[in-house]
Amino acid sequence: MTWPLPDRLSINSAISGSAVDLSSFAEFLRRQAPELLPASIKHGGGAVGDQLPHATTIVALKYPGGVLIAGDRRSTQGNMIAGRDVRKVYITDDYTATGIAGTAAIAVEFARLYAVELEHYEKLEGVPLTFAGKVNRLAIMVRGNLAAAMQGLVALPLLASYDIHASDPRSAGRIVSFDAAGGWNIEEEGYQAVGSGSIFAKSSIKKLYAQVTDADSALRVAVEALYDAADDDSATGGPDLVRGIYPTAVTINADGAVDVPEVRIAELAREVIGSRSRADTFGPDGGEK
């Protein structure tokens, strides 16, 4: 395709005149086409967050040699279930994955834009961003959404990464949480959760985290945590055996980030539900037949 010469010249002059950081794709969009960024709205529009679908609970756990991040599949719109099979966890580069809770449309665009941001930097600079650089880039993106967040369009990411520059590969898993203003915190306890069911998920993980010894045990604890969150939080969806809908998860270790096969998640979900099922022990007969 041939671009008209005037358009090409105007774009080039705008870039040179504004000193855009070409290594940042998000900054380039902000200068050249801000309407393409998530939640490109202006102040004064009123709160509209409750009118849009919201994604809910994300959990992340470190295990020896890596980190796992998982999310439920439900989205809600007020008191209604808007979707049952929403994907909330995305691999964003070879050693990084993000899960985002909040306004669903913005959350998905955040994850996609962040993946492009990391790829764009690596293509221009010839090297991938360091772990610290990845955290800073995501913090800047979250901060850029602050105006929309104040109108109810909040999207909070949870970052899981494997630091290839860590001195000890067994403790190279990283979990970073963010607030709406772009502040971030590296979790030292080994686990974190965000979203409406996060308080229940974290309470569950706290009791089970001692059982985490590898990726598979971390996955089981994550499934249990999401099950517990769904038990108390209506906006979080637990494993749905009838529809065959299960949480999604990503593991990240020295070999890179990979999606956990749905077959394995379904197997663990059935085990968790089976282990928690019990005969009716209520009533005058105490459950005796």
Curated annotation (Swiss-Prot):
Its EC number is 3.4.25.1. Signal peptide: none annotated. GO terms for biological process: modification-dependent protein catabolic process; proteasomal protein catabolic process. GO terms for molecular function: threonine-type endopeptidase activity. Residues 1-55 form a propeptide. The active site is at T56. GO terms for cellular component: cytoplasm; proteasome core complex, beta-subunit complex. It catalyses: Cleavage of peptide bonds with very broad specificity. It is found in: Cytoplasm. Pathway: Protein degradation; proteasomal Pup-dependent pathway. Disulfide bonds: none annotated. Belongs to the peptidase T1B family. Component of the proteasome core, a large protease complex with broad specificity involved in protein degradation. HAMAP family: Proteasome_B_B. This is Proteasome subunit beta.
